[in-house]
Amino acid sequence: MLPRRPLAWPAWLLRGAPGAAGSWGRPVGPLARRGCCSAPGTPEVPLTRERYPVRRLPFSTVSKQDLAAFERIVPGGVVTDPEALQAPNVDWLRTLRGCSKVLLRPRTSEEVSHILRHCHERNLAVNPQGGNTGMVGGSVPVFDEIILSTARMNRVLSFHSVSGILVCQAGCVLEELSRYVEERDFIMPLDLGAKGSCHIGGNVATNAGGLRFLRYGSLHGTVLGLEVVLADGTVLDCLTSLRKDNTGYDLKQLFIGSEGTLGIITTVSILCPPKPRAVNVAFLGCPGFAEVLQTFSTCKGMLGEILSAFEFMDAVCMQLVGRHLHLASPVQESPFYVLIETSGSNAGHDAEKLGHFLEHALGSGLVTDGTMATDQRKVKMLWALRERITEALSRDGYVYKYDLSLPVERLYDIVTDLRARLGPHAKHVVGYGHLGDGNLHLNVTAEAFSPSLLAALEPHVYEWTAGQQGSVSAEHGVGFRKRDVLGYSKPPGALQLMQQLKALLDPKGILNPYKTLPSQA
């Protein structure tokens, strides 16, 4: 039942630790390992070129003269050691592997400019890489592209305490930026499960959505300016810190979501909202998906402006989080669970509104059980149940991941459809995501990669999504995995214009090749 007094956190919620911090703290699994370096005994990831039908384009190969030139541009920032290159060649899901022989670690936009000028002259392909936490293979090479890492471009350049405008380099880690602005009574407008590793430049390049999208919208609205280095080394300065600028084309929008195919983002200007004085989280069990939808409608009506997140997950998600991460549900077992967050300026006012909503939801049968938290520690505990689902899935076997945007009322139908379609051939079929913006994370696990299972999933998932007028990528981007399925979400004319923009800004095609755009539009 919903607590009517201050929450006394049950001891069994912390089972499986030693100690609460070990179980509920910052993830210690793959997300915490940048580049997802192989653990001892882990099977080697097959080369992408051997698993997928892709041919290398006629780029040059890196020579000793190229390495010498790079060493002059970034002294001490040229990595050629094969062991050190293993992790950045492999994607986070451990399903794609390139064979790059060199990684460059510039510190400044000027160094990036010199690198790209040299690569443009020599026709050398470049793979930009941030925290390497992407889900669609956009951040790792397909063949032997040079990896350009932004990891050393990690300085905050300015922060204005009145406007909340942050200017920083692209390699700043999202969690560290969050800590920086929170110390100044602001928050970042996005929050991701991968925040401990992902870079703000990668977030912008992929137009990452995340857990605060419902309240603060997309990066197309919160990013005020960008500095971008084009394929030929030209530095494009669109780094305004103005909230209003109606002079000509808004060029920065081209690069938000372009996944490093049009230019490399080196500096970001972003608007940070004020830090809420009161944050409350409720975790509820629902008897069915229809009740999840009704709870969301009721929630919007009763909570209004203080509603900042509405997440849902199915029972299988909770079972996997418990099995692989030893995190227990704080409510009784239910077919579905929802996590609701409110953020506001008046703790008493917000708690009262949330309490009235919870009483109504329970009394009307929308919710069968629930609990809520107001202090930061317990809030983080409840959020961990949602944020660490991806980690739990990665421990369940090979994962087929789909990031779909669908009409809210049809959001879960594809999950039940696939369970019937796949039967025992899939280990688990789960659905969770951001109900507030119609984003479903559909995941299918199996003991190992299976071509027959993949054939049963694709193109069926994309055809089903197109039939609902949905999108095959809600927030993860396109990368390598989805480049040839854009036609399910974009008309031929739009694809042709994208190809024309790519040819204009990167005529040699050296920036992140084999990604984002179809091989043939």
Curated annotation (Swiss-Prot):
Activated by zinc and cobalt ions. It catalyses: (R)-2-hydroxyglutarate + A = 2-oxoglutarate + AH2; (R)-malate + A = oxaloacetate + AH2. Keywords: Disease variant, FAD, Flavoprotein, Metal-binding, Mitochondrion, Oxidoreductase, Transit peptide, Zinc. Its cofactor is FAD. Changing residue 147 to S: In D2HGA1; uncertain significance; severe phenotype; almost complete loss of catalytic activity. Changing residue 443 to A: Significantly reduced catalytic activity. Changing residue 131 to V: In D2HGA1; uncertain significance; complete loss of catalytic activity. It is found in: Mitochondrion. Changing residue 426 to T: In D2HGA1; uncertain significance; no effect on catalytic activity. (R)-lactate binds at residues 386, 476. (R)-2-hydroxyglutarate binds at residues 386, 390, 401, 443, 476. InterPro entries: FAD-bd_oxidored_4_C, FAD-bd_PCMH, FAD-bd_PCMH-like_sf, FAD-bd_PCMH_sub1, FAD-bd_PCMH_sub2, FAD-linked_Oxase-like_C, FAD-oxidored/transferase_4, Oxid_FAD_bind_N. Its EC number is 1.1.99.39. The keyword Cell cycle does not apply. It holds the Pfam family FAD_binding_4. (R)-malate binds at residues 386, 390, 401, 476. It comes from the Eukaryota. Belongs to the FAD-binding oxidoreductase/transferase type 4 family. Catalyzes the oxidation of D-2-hydroxyglutarate (D-2-HG) to alpha-ketoglutarate. Also catalyzes the oxidation of other D-2-hydroxyacids, such as D-malate (D-MAL) and D-lactate (D-LAC). Exhibits high activities towards D-2-HG and D-MAL but a very weak activity towards D-LAC. This is D-2-hydroxyglutarate dehydrogenase, mitochondrial. The gene is D2HGDH.
